[in-house]
Regions:
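DNA-recognition helix of helix-turn-helix
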Residues: 41-65
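Helix-turn-helix DNA-binding module
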Residues: 14, 30-47
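Acidic, proline/glycine-rich intrinsically disordered inter-domain spacer in sigma factors
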Residues: 1-11
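Short helix-coil-helix linker/hinge
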Residues: 13-20
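Short, conserved glycine- and acidic-residue-centered signature motifs
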Residues: 2, 30, 52
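A short pre-motif secondary-structure segment
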Residues: 23-24
Length: 66
């Protein structure tokens, strides 16, 4: 079940725009703060917050879809 969910999240990330996917990966897997992610991507912190909201909502939908 966990492996299946991770595979679904991976597929969901593949469908995300590059900036959303990059922000999510930098934050969640590299442990960067939103400020650091914003600097790395050359965008504002509010943009990173929007990207993360989009990615987290999509992950939630994958994890809890019935």
């Amino acid at each position: 079940l966990i492996l299946e969910t991770l595979m679904q999240i991976d597929a969901m990330l593949d469908r995300m725009p590059d900036n959303v996917r990059q922000a999510f990966l930098l934050s969640q897997f590299e442990g960067l703060s939103y400020v650091q992610v914003a600097e790395r991507l050359g965008v504002s912190v509010s943009s990173v917050q929007k990207y993360m909201t989009r990615a987290i909502v999509a992950c939630y939908q994958v994890a809890y879809a019935e």
